[in-house]
Amino acid sequence: MTDVTVADIAPAPLAFATRLGASHVENVSGGEEGLKAQAASRPYDVAFEVSGTAAGLASAIGIVRRGGVVVQIGNLPGGQIPTPSNAVMAKEIDLRGSFRFGFEFMNAVELIADGSVDVLSLVTAERPLSTAPDALRLALDRSQSVKVVLTAN
């Protein structure tokens, strides 16, 4: 992968994506016009939907090229959700589900162990175990953190 675009509604995850090497970041809190304009000139081959929202899934379907792939990673709400099924059919999109934490866990451990993945770059804060309640509040605040690690004190 040489061209990676990350879209989010919060500035902190976008700044983090830039630090990790994203080619382009797009703040979609005010709408998706910029993302759609970029996709209109160069549709994406693959889109990973990680927000777990129907709007996120519809957006991913809308920005991939004909024959592109949309991978649903975010946990969608239960029940029926509106999906632009005609766009999936007309654009011949490959819509894939991904059950996180299934068989991938051992693969992830192996990638971390052999150094293929630098997990420390994902850590945005370390807090002592004695401050666990505050650390958990920080971890829930996407505007300030990506991953928070508790350390033994």
Locate each region found by the language model:
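Adenosine-nucleotide cofactor-binding segment
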Residues: 1-59
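Short beta->alpha linker loops
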Residues: 8-9, 29-30, 51-52, 76, ...
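C-terminal hydrophobic helical "lid"/dimerization subdomain
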Residues: 11, 58, 102, 106-153
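Short, hinge-like loop/turn segments at secondary-structure boundaries
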Residues: 21-26, 44, 87-90, 112-116, ...
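Conserved beta-strand scaffold positions in the cores of enzyme catalytic domains, especially
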Residues: 24-25, 95, 122, 126
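Glycine-rich phosphate-binding loop and adjacent beta-alpha segment
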Residues: 54-114, 152-153
